[in-house]
Curated annotation (Swiss-Prot):
The gene is MT-CO2. The lineage of its organism: Eukaryota, Metazoa, Chordata, Craniata, Vertebrata. This is Cytochrome c oxidase subunit 2. It comes from Gerbillus gerbillus (Lesser Egyptian gerbil). Keywords: Copper, Electron transport, Magnesium, Membrane, Metal-binding, Mitochondrion, Mitochondrion inner membrane, Respiratory chain, Translocase, Transmembrane, Transmembrane helix, Transport. Component of the cytochrome c oxidase (complex IV, CIV), a multisubunit enzyme composed of 14 subunits. The complex is composed of a catalytic core of 3 subunits MT-CO1, MT-CO2 and MT-CO3, encoded in the mitochondrial DNA, and 11 supernumerary subunits COX4I, COX5A, COX5B, COX6A, COX6B, COX6C, COX7A, COX7B, COX7C, COX8 and NDUFA4, which are encoded in the nuclear genome. Cu cation A2 binds at C196, E198, C200, H204. It catalyses: 4 Fe(II)-[cytochrome c] + O2 + 8 H(+)(in) = 4 Fe(III)-[cytochrome c] + 2 H2O + 4 H(+)(out). SUPFAM superfamilies: Cupredoxins, Cytochrome c oxidase subunit II-like, transmembrane region. Its main location: mitochondrion. Its cofactor is Cu cation.
Length: 227
């Protein structure tokens, strides 16, 4: 989860988020090098007194500044496309959870189990226990098994919402009348926090998401107790 005054990304807890962080660093390095080169050339132009008035064309230079940006764009596009396909790909999910957005709460249905569904509301500030996080705790957490592929089917009952958990690299729009898909695979157990990331009305800020990732055996015990 995020901390006060944090400048970087949240710690990665899924393969997708690890790839996204690597891509962020890769792209940032390219942007830094280009910016440094441009600033250096601007400083050079402002500080030098030399001029070249007789140059009418420079085909070699034009070739370089056409090919070089194309190579840079390819260096950015290839890893981006790889991550895009990784996010869309899902092979033999062990579990499917249907997520519905409402004003202003989430509802979850474990489609592989009978009668395993519940609503998830934010816990009001005056009902929080010591150590709980304001505006982030819910009365019913989503409990999922770790290290296994899980499919999330996401939609909405009313207006546009967005189901997002940053540390897992997830952000999927919940659109009325449309079913979107996302994949979750957590590398480790833990509790992961997210929020609705689409302005959806006056209580948009009060739609937290809490995922609890646990070992498969504990998940089986939890699902039996819930049904």
């Amino acid at each position: 989860m995020a901390y006060p005054f944090q400048l970087g990304l949240q710690d990665a807890s899924s393969p997708i988020m690890e790839e996204l962080m690597n891509f962020h660093d890769h792209t940032l390095m390219i942007v830094f090098l280009i910016s440094s080169l441009v600033l250096y050339l601007m400083a050079l132009m402002l500080s030098t007194k030399l001029i070249h008035t007789s140059t009418m064309d420079a085909q070699e230079v034009e070739t370089i500044w056409t090919i070089l940006p194309a190579i840079i764009l390819i260096m950015i596009a290839l890893p981006s496309l790889r991550i895009l396909y990784m996010m869309d790909e899902i092979n033999n999910p062990i579990l499917t959870v249907k997520t519905m957005g409402h004003q202003w709460y989430w509802s979850y249905e474990y489609t592989d189990y009978e009668d395993l569904c519940f609503d998830s509301y934010m816990i009001p500030t005056n009902e929080l226990k010591p150590g709980e996080l304001r505006l982030l705790e819910v009365d019913n957490r989503i409990v999922l098994p770790m290290e296994l592929p899980i499919r999330m089917l996401i939609s909405s009952e009313d207006v546009l919402h967005s189901w997002a958990v940053p540390s897992l690299g997830l952000k999927t729009d919940a659109i009325p009348g449309r079913l979107n898909q996302a994949t979750i695979t957590s590398n480790r157990p833990g509790v992961f926090y997210g929020q609705c990331s689409e302005i959806c009305g006056s209580n948009h800020s009060f739609m937290p998401i809490v995922l609890e990732m646990i070992p498969l055996k504990l998940f089986e015990n939890w699902s039996m107790s819930m049904t």
